[in-house]
Amino acid sequence: MTNIRKSHPLFKIINDSLIDLPAPSNISSWWNFGSLLGICLAIQILTGLFLAMHYTSDTTTAFQSVTHICRDVNYGWILRYLHANGASMFFICLFLHVGRGLYYGSYMYKETWNVGVILLFAVMATAFMGYVLPWGQMSFWGATVITNLLSAIPYIGTKLVEWIWGGFSVDKATLTRFFAFHFLLPFIISALVLVHLLFLHETGSNNPTGVPSDSDMIPFHPYYTIKDMLGALVMILALLMLVLFSPDLLGDPDNYIPANPLNTPAHSKPEWYFLFAYAILRSIPNKLGGVLALVLSILILILMPLLHTSKQRSMMFRPLSPCMFWLLVADLLTLAWIGGQPVEHPCIIIGHFASILYFLLILVLMPIMSIVDNHLLKW
């Protein structure tokens, strides 16, 4: 009799994806982040579902409902902080996952990579709308500032902003629709994750060397299931440490002040994971130019397969390309730091240089360095 795992229509899909899946024998811990992102998504959907049972998306009661969750609901405080800090953990894993893809040339699987970029946009949109829901000062002014950027679009900009707001300012209609979309998007993200995996399993996984590993494959279970469980354990431990010891470390104190349209915060800034893009936006004096730079800072990832000039897929054996990669990492950290600083000297000029360097590295310096590597290795 055939094993039910291999014959049942549903179990067969799970078996081919998680158990008998042939995987390269040499993939490192950098390949753990896909499964960690899946766990993060599950945590966010579960905690979000329970929070939605107690939250009210009305401007008069939203802030109070979050207070009620933290004070009166059984374990409401841990649900709220798991959800808020779970988003931070989600983005840490996302950035590391994308960074691994850039370093090891995983972007050469174009379909998987493009779906991944769409996923990144969807997660960023979800996180932005989630930040608006507690209806604190940063929530309100963040929503006002970011949605207002769309008014830079010629001809239709102002109408588009008013249509998104559902009125002439950020108000009850805006909060209600943001809650609706914040609830819906994670399920769309889950569907996109399945598409992402579908494309990945069409080609098989990349490996650190960038060399095809068809001749040296091992079953996913037990080798990589155990490895993923260890990664999950470390991540969940880090998340619980953050939630239980310093839950407000990555938040903004201004968001504990109820939203007040008549009082602007001294320094409006988004959550830490948007700071690099916010710094690029702020560094361009023109509003439309800033919005375009903001979108392009993420959309530029789509161009990675076209900008690949090396004869090697991975950066593992290239002498100079890794230097450019780590310069890009340092530049992104600089942008994130600048995004959180007030708009004054010397932060303005550092922001300008870091923004120019970001686009210069991806579009010019990294492709040139790959060509130099080809010559150095006499390829």
UniProtKB/Swiss-Prot annotation:
Keywords: Electron transport, Heme, Iron, Membrane, Metal-binding, Mitochondrion, Mitochondrion inner membrane, Respiratory chain, Transmembrane, Transmembrane helix, Transport, Ubiquinone. GO terms for molecular function: metal ion binding; ubiquinol-cytochrome-c reductase activity. This is Cytochrome b. Its cofactor is heme b. Heme b b566 binds at H97, H196. Binds 2 heme b groups non-covalently. Heme b b562 binds at H83, H182. It comes from Pteropus vampyrus. It is found in: Mitochondrion inner membrane. A ubiquinone binds at H201. The chain crosses the membrane at residues 33-53, 77-98, 113-133, 178-198, 226-246, 288-308, 320-340, 347-367. The cytochrome bc1 complex contains 11 subunits: 3 respiratory subunits (MT-CYB, CYC1 and UQCRFS1), 2 core proteins (UQCRC1 and UQCRC2) and 6 low-molecular weight proteins (UQCRH/QCR6, UQCRB/QCR7, UQCRQ/QCR8, UQCR10/QCR9, UQCR11/QCR10 and a cleavage product of UQCRFS1). This cytochrome bc1 complex then forms a dimer. GO terms for biological process: mitochondrial electron transport, ubiquinol to cytochrome c. It comes from the Eukaryota. Component of the ubiquinol-cytochrome c reductase complex (complex III or cytochrome b-c1 complex) that is part of the mitochondrial respiratory chain. The b-c1 complex mediates electron transfer from ubiquinol to cytochrome c. Contributes to the generation of a proton gradient across the mitochondrial membrane that is then used for ATP synthesis. It is a multi-pass membrane protein. Gene3D superfamilies: Cytochrome Bc1 Complex, Chain C. GO terms for cellular component: mitochondrial inner membrane; respiratory chain complex III. Its main location: mitochondrion. Heme 1 (or BL or b562) is low-potential and absorbs at about 562 nm, and heme 2 (or BH or b566) is high-potential and absorbs at about 566 nm. Disulfide bonds: none annotated. Belongs to the cytochrome b family.
